[in-house]
C-alpha cells in the first residue's frame, strides 16, 4: 500500500456522520483530521467505529475499509472486511466464519460493497 493510501474513517461524536482522514488515537479517545482541513481542525470521533482503508476497491471502484460489508456476485454470500493480526492482512470473513485473504478474493471474485457493520447493524 502506498503511503498516501493510509487513511481512516470513523463516526463523528457530534453528529454521527462519517469523516475520513488521518487518525490520532489516545488512550480513551480518537480524533481524525480530514486531508482537506487545517492541521488544528481535529474532529472527535467514536473510537469503536475507527476503520482503516485497505488500499483496495470493489468492482464499482468503491474504496474498501475495515468493517465494510461485501457481497460476492453470483453467490449468496456476504462477508465483513476485518484486519487479521495473525495473518497481517485484511480478510473477508463470511457469515459462516470462513475467512479469506481480501486481496486474493478481489482477484478471483466480483465483489460489491453494500455498507458497513456500523450502519447495517441487525
Spans of model-derived segments:
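Secondary-structure transition motif
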Residues: 1-122
